[in-house]
């Protein structure tokens, strides 16, 4: 089976794990959040991985960096939603801390990738 370039990126692999963790965790959210925070968290988390993947299909570094920036913006959205979910008691502190650490790792990786793509 053919492997695509995005699959080889450590940041995409780390985000893939993050997506699975968020999906697992949000299964325990209250039913009334199914179309609120659950939907938003899942969509934003998937958006991180999707924009990393889409960016690898672009020909110029500038275009690639644009999609990495969008992925980073989606990550900031996820971090905000995790904070709110923790504040509302939907996520235990331990789970929040673990997700926050992974998000920070992904943030650093995205920044490094964006700097590389921008020639910096």
Residue ranges of model-derived segments:
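Amphipathic alpha-helical assembly/interaction segments
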Residues: 1-120
């Amino acid at each position: 089976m053919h492997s695509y370039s995005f699959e080889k990126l450590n940041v995409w692999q780390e985000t893939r794990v993050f997506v699975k963790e968020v999906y697992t965790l949000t299964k325990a959210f209250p039913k009334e959040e199914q179309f609120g925070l659950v939907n938003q968290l899942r969509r934003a988390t998937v958006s991180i991985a999707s924009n990393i993947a889409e960016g690898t299909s672009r020909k110029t570094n500038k275009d690639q960096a644009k999609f990495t920036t969008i992925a980073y913006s989606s990550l900031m959205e996820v971090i905000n939603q995790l904070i709110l979910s923790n504040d509302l008691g939907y996520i235990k502190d331990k789970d929040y801390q673990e997700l926050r650490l992974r998000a920070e790792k992904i943030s650093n990786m995205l920044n490094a990738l964006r700097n590389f793509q921008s020639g910096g």
